């Protein structure tokens, strides 16, 4: 590992204390880039790695909503817009009780590279809230999503940042978010992906990631002169990829 990479990893840990998930992914990614960095000294001069590991913008906001019992609830919301070098920020929204800046930064940082590999002009970002949708009624989820979008709408747009779903955020939640966005800005535009078919969504969207994993695995095996026949597949964490 180059001295420059080591310094950047340590700097990231110092600037983001206690965010272990973010530390881990930064260390893994930057370590893998060492051969490239050593061959391109101009990257260090341009502080490329420092810029990659620092979000272009980070927003933390309060989400106030009312539950079915009429009690006011308060959650935290986040949106980290990591990198827009090749296009608008793109990345999901996660609703889970363990969501905090470290997880959102970890996911947003990885999203830069995942999106660039598609060949599409999209940057990387991620967002979410510590809201737990489990056990909540449809009406509670709707009110929460509306409260999120009431703050989030000012930070997103079809040419700025296009969120999607993630853990705890499926077609229902995207629909509630999109409805509130339209209500506020009075425009029907491509600001969220993962919508239902009646609201401009795409057929096969929910299955796309799962199929993509299989096709990607097939291509990796093919590149090494192998195929899927008789292979044993281990699945560790599938979130919303599996539909029964």
Predicted regions and their residues:
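N-terminal ligand-binding/catalytic initiation module
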Residues: 1-203, 207, 216, 220-223
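Glycine-rich Rossmann-fold phosphate-binding loop(s) that bind the pyrophosphate
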Residues: 238
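Short helix-loop-beta connector
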Residues: 226-230
